């Protein structure tokens, strides 16, 4: 910068003057002027932030109002890994949810003496097996949630709602309600920088399963799992730690198992068996996949393949209860009912508290014509352990074989089970007319 000429005459500017005029005026702002700092200082994406003088990056603050230190601009700034605020108010639309049908529920369960109030905490309802009440409470809390931007709460409540509907065998209803999420592959659910997904992984898996099971769109379900598997592979490549890689590998293998599950549900047992045989696993995971293959080949009726897979699982890590049960089931599938009953009786003596073994023993006795013994075992199971679906179904079948007044006995059984305070043992409290064969 030069001094403009005055009166038509100029003078020579010395080097010292030029040096002084080239320097900008130093800032004299104090702590109270810190708010005048350009906004780019707090912008983690601003390229000029690291080059700012340290005096401006860390302005002095009044001692009476200490503030936490700002994260360094050359590292991950606060908020980059967190999901930006999204308005999920569309999940709170009461029209997206339905009144649960009660036509398939025995009357004793609708007017149970020990049913907890709907105002009970959802976790308590889930632990006690009251899935119908938990589903109702979840959607009430979801619709009345104060903040449509509370992603974690809203998505958790929706997950509880859909999972409870599945546990109540209302898959079609759950599939219909899951459509409130829209397209989970849209950019709306993605972090703009990290590409992280807003929706928790278990809920995404459930939505894919509902697309297949709720509407019978099996191919769509398989394609959905393959899409999630592609994301797993990409995340394994981008993972920064071994723990993160292990997590995504586990999810990838789980997607493969779920594909086999869809193949089983659509009746393609041979395809499911071949698919399971292609899954890569290590250690105990190899045993887990081999046991799944064993069950699939049992459904197919290929006993030699079932024995081969069971032998591979036993060589990996033997388990007397599981391996013995599968060996007995192979005998049962081969129509060797007496041998299967002997296998299960030995297991029942070693594991008297295992309800699965006791029920299978009762079924084998039923096939060998010992209906009274089978009825005794199943009746004792109902009294001593939390009743599960197949147990009630088998006992109702025995009632049909033993008496013409079986409907009265089934209804009495329903009243007895409805008088329980909770499900317990990881099973639901409510049972449907299907289990009682009403």
Give the location of each predicted region.
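Internal amphipathic alpha-helical repeat/solenoid segments
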Residues: 88-157, 175-192
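TPR-repeat structural position
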Residues: 131-132, 171, 217-218, 269, ...
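"A position-specific structural signal for the A-helix of alpha-solenoid helical repeats
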Residues: 120-124, 160-162, 167, 199-210, ...
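Intrinsically disordered, low-complexity acidic/proline-rich regions
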Residues: 1-114
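Solenoid-like repeat scaffolds
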Residues: 105-110, 141-149, 181-186, 229-231, ...
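Structured C-terminal portions of repeat-based eukaryotic scaffold domains
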Residues: 307-438
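Structural motif corresponding to the intra-repeat A-B loop/turn of tetratricopeptide repeats
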Residues: 128, 168, 214-215, 266, ...
């Amino acid at each position: 910068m030069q001094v403009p000429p005055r009166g038509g005459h100029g003078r020579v500017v010395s080097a010292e003057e030029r040096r002084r005029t080239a320097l900008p005026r130093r800032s004299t702002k104090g702590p109270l002027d810190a708010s005048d700092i350009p906004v780019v200082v707090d912008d983690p994406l601003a390229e000029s932030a690291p080059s700012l003088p340290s005096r401006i990056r860390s302005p002095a603050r009044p001692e009476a109002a200490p503030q936490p230190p700002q994260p360094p601009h050359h590292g991950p700034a606060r908020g980059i890994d967190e999901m930006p605020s999204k308005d999920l108010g569309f999940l709170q639309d009461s029209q997206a949810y339905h009144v649960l049908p009660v036509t398939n529920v025995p009357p004793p369960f609708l007017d149970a003496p020990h049913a907890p109030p709907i105002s009970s905490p959802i976790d308590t309802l889930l632990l006690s097996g009251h899935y119908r009440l938990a589903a109702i409470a979840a959607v009430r809390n979801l619709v009345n949630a104060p903040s449509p931007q509370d992603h974690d709460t809203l998505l958790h409540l929706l997950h509880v709602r859909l999972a409870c509907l599945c546990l109540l065998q209302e898959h079609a209803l759950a599939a219909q309600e899951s459509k409130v999420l829209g397209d989970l592959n849209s950019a709306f659910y993605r972090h703009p920088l990290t590409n992280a997904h807003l929706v928790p992984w278990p809920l995404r898996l459930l939505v894919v399963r509902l697309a297949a099971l709720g509407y019978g769109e099996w191919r769509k379900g398989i394609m959905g799992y393959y899409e999630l598997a592609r994301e797993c592979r990409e995340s394994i490549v981008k993972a920064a730690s071994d723990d993160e890689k292990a997590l995504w590998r586990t999810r990838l293998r789980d997607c493969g198992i779920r594909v086999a599950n869809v193949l089983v549900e659509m009746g393609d047992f041979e395809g499911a068996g071949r698919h399971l045989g292609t899954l890569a696993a290590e250690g105990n995971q190899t045993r887990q996949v081999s046991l799944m293959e064993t069950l699939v080949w049992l459904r197919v009726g290929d006993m030699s393949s079932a024995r081969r897979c069971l032998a591979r699982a036993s060589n990996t890590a033997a388990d007397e209860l599981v391996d013995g049960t599968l060996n007995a089931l192979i005998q049962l599938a081969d129509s060797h009912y007496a041998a299967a009953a002997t296998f299960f009786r030995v297991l029942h003596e070693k594991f008297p508290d295992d309800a699965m073994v006791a029920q299978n023993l009762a079924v084998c006795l039923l096939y060998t014509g010992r209906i009274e013994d089978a009825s005794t075992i199943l009746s004792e199971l109902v009294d001593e352990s939390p009743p599960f679906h197949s147990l009630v179904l088998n006992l109702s079948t025995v009632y049909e074989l033993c008496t013409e007044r079986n409907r009265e006995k089934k209804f009495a059984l329903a009243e007895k089970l409805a008088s329980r305070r909770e499900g317990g043992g990881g099973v639901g409290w409510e049972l449907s007319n299907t289990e009682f064969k009403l």
